[in-house]
């Protein structure tokens, strides 16, 4: 019913067309001159040295180097060891090796962009190829085309794609999340799920969990989702593959958590305390006393770890001994559990930043493009602009959205007894859980520091939820229309 006269699944053709459209969109938006990327903001250094790359012109002014302009070209250097723990550096290093083959003098950031683009196109093709099959070829075509259009409109937005030509870890997590969910849907929709598809799911899920230390706990949930795939096939080989994959995710997540450097823990803890709990508190003395922090550190309330000219230097050994080595993030969690109203205030603060896919304070253009300092591109920014204009600005608004989504998933799960359907629904439940997790963890783990960028994964998960709602609505509408047509014919 969903095949053409040559016996080909129409979704294959639409998937390839969607992949071609995604590639053309990427080339036109970020690779064709003027090249689009994101300015550094000071984060690239922890990735470049480990990946064998370096800044090509370090003599630029601070604003030019980190905020005003993205940079198209970088230099090559030796490989250094650093405290940045992430599999993201492996991806960047591979792009660096490809870059050396193409041009041994300078690294063009478009090589990295092309690597991300290839993975993004793969995800789009997987999603569309395994879109829901309908009873007629026309209905299947419409369903696949709608899904392709929504995926390109949302995740092809310049807000996401500008990240591809930067050394931030965000695009790595985005691509991994898309591939993880796409492969999960592909597995759930297959009559005989392939081991290579499950391997892709495991690799992508592990990439998300190891993209940054804050995402590591997600690997535990991904392992549970992998285990739920045991019933997709009944043979012993499949069960061994699933159990092995779940174990890899479990162990990888635990190792990622254990690998967090002490210095990074102390930086994040400082942010959680002084730029989180104690920031804007109406009861500073009480909160400091409850946490066991001496009153002499009161001037640090509201400061971040990288701020200059604080009353007490952030690297002061006494501060480390009396505060950062004595407290832990467990104390932060306990504080917020005792003072839920304070945590709600922090969630409202997060909600004020939750709709921003990209940081608007970072320039998108290389200086050679002749654009004003800090200029950003608004080409194909319909989705990101809509979010800024229309998304909730309070935690209560997002609570309602997530509760409604959870209830809808529960209803679909109960209605469908098929194990394959339930795995697909559970995949989206994991996405929603990851979104909620990605909103809460930055507040506990890093206070209000750089909230806009730290909520990137929240945006990814929220937008995947939106795509699933739109696709689900069209699926229901097409089924209803088909039923009405059949009833008229039979009547």
Spans of features found by a protein language model:
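Hydrophobic transmembrane helix bundles of membrane-integrated enzymes that assemble
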Residues: 1-33, 88-278, 389-481
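Non-catalytic effector/regulatory segments
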Residues: 9-40, 280-309, 316-317, 378-390
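Extracytoplasmic loop-helix module adjacent to an early transmembrane segment
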Residues: 24-100
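Membrane-proximal cytoplasmic C-terminal regulatory module of class A 7TM GPCRs
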Residues: 482-489
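Membrane-proximal, non-transmembrane alpha-helical segments
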Residues: 337, 342, 346-414, 421-425, ...
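Alpha-helical transmembrane segments of integral membrane proteins, especially early/N-terminal helices
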Residues: 42, 75-78, 134-141, 354-363, ...
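Individual transmembrane alpha-helix segments
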Residues: 68-115, 318-332, 336, 385-394
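Membrane-proximal stem/loop segments at transmembrane-domain junctions that anchor or position
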Residues: 48-80, 261-371
